[in-house]
Curated annotation (Swiss-Prot):
Family the UniProt entry places it in: Belongs to the polysaccharide lyase 1 family.
Gene name as annotated: P18
Classification lineage: Eukaryota, Viridiplantae, Streptophyta, Embryophyta, Tracheophyta
Stated name of the protein: Probable pectate lyase 18
Function recorded in the entry: May have a role in the development of the transmitting tissue of the style and/or in the events related to pollination such as some aspect in the facilitation of compatible pollen tube growth.
Record localization: Secreted
Length: 404
């Protein structure tokens, strides 16, 4: 990597393009792929490194032994979702039954029975499980789903819905192959069930949610989005996740006409956007979005996009462009003529651009710190550290009775 150096060019009277030039592109790309392979190896070893430069992993590595509730776990959160406390003040609920999913009268010991309770709960799993739901899993507030110590998969059916609830932490879960559900009754609390229309088939759907933290999950191959946050959702952190094999990865904002999303604030940090991804990493509307210290190793159309004048603050990320000549641009300004999107506030600061990647800056530009104050949620680390920061992205293979 010593042969790498940056040159940023300013195009007069046009949106800014952030580009980097490298002396030997092939060597740099090979080095990045070696880094990715090493990260996968370390992840499978089953421990978190305090020296990775990742502040969440540093704190998680100091937590008590698995199987014991740690109130300090919630204090590991960073970014706009840092106030998500999950089930910190509640008892431990152990999921023992991976089957018997009854959407209306869930059986005690199932994940569905746990997430609908009115009280705060810290939900853990007795053993490795594959959970195939019959209807979407509608969560009540103040819940932590903690998959550490087991290999937990939610797949093959509808997946997770956070609907007008708050203070939810989802950690260490494999979420994949999520399907649409049909119309049907679903219980969302011990005392209420109601009729739900067909779901979108998202991995995690956040609808009017607040104080949400999704961390160290793997997400792939769902019917619609992997994570979608819409309808006034805010105070969200999406961190340390491993995204693969999907088209429309992450939607933040319901529609161009839904102006209630103007107050949305989302942090996307320390994630690895890996093989088989096409677009929306994320796609933003209206609000304020801090995209920081992520590793983008694959995209087919674009990485970061948006419409309806979102403020996007991209800092300290690593972007490895595809080899195809016309797919080098990181960004995509959508659903507006250039005369409009030129004024949208999108900046790239300290990002590492590889293999011809470039970021089209618009609006106030990188130097206007006040413009990006509402889209700033933590201090970015240097992009040269992204490989180590994201080395444990996705669920970590922790063992019960020991620290992660």
């Amino acid at each position: 990597m010593s042969t790498l150096f940056f040159t940023f060019s300013l195009l007069l009277l046009a949106p800014l393009l952030v580009i980097s030039s490298i002396q030997d592109p092939e060597l740099v790309v090979q080095d990045v792929h070696r880094s990715i392979n090493a990260s996968l190896t370390r992840r499978n070893l089953g421990y978190l490194s305090c020296g990775s430069g990742n502040p969440i992993d540093r704190l998680l590595a100091m937590q008590p032994q698995l199987g014991k509730k740690s109130p300090a776990f919630s204090y590991c959160a960073i970014g706009f979702g840092k106030n998500a406390i999950g089930g910190k003040n509640g008892r431990i609920y152990v999921v023992t039954d991976s089957g018997n999913d009854d959407p209306v009268n869930p059986k005690p010991g199932t994940l569905r029975h746990a997430v609908i309770q009115d009280e705060p709960l810290w939900i853990i799993f007795k053993r490795d499980m594959v959970i195939q739901l019959k209807q979407e899993l509608v969560m009540n507030s103040y819940k932590t789903i903690d998959g550490r110590g087991a290999s937990v998969h939610i797949s093959g059916g509808p997946c997770i819905t956070i609907h007008h609830t708050s203070n939810i932490i989802i950690h260490g879960i494999n979420i994949h192959d999520c399907k649409q559900s049909g119309n049907g009754n679903i219980r969302d609390s011990p005392n209420h069930s109601g009729w739900w229309d067909v779901s979108d088939g998202d991995g995690i759907s956040i609808f009017g949610g607040k104080n949400i933290w999704v961390d160290h999950c793997s997400l792939s191959n769902c019917h619609d989005g992997l994570i979608d946050a819409i309808h006034g959702s805010t105070a969200i952190t999406i961190s340390n996740n491993y995204f693969t094999h999907h088209d429309k990865v992450m939607l933040l904002g319901h529609s161009d006409s839904f102006t209630q999303d103007k107050g949305m604030q989302v942090t996307v940090a320390f994630n690895h956007f890996g093989e088989g991804l096409v677009q929306r990493m994320p796609r933003c509307r209206h609000g304020y979005f801090h995209v920081v210290n992520n590793d983008y190793t694959h995209w087919e159309m674009y990485a970061i996009g948006g419409s309806a004048a979102p403020t996007i603050n991209s800092q300290g990320n690593r972007f490895l462009a595809p080899n195809e000549k016309y797919r080098k641009e990181v960004t995509k300004h959508e659903d507006a003529p250039e005369s409009q999107w030129r004024s949208w506030n999108w900046r790239s600061e300290g990002d590492l651009m590889l293999n011809g990647a470039y970021f089209r800056q618009t609006g106030a530009g990188a130097s206007s710190s006040s413009t990006y104050a509402r889209a700033s949620s933590l201090s970015a680390r240097p992009s040269s550290l992204v490989g180590s920061i994201t080395t444990n992205a996705g669920p970590v293979n922790c063992k019960k009775g020991s620290r992660c």
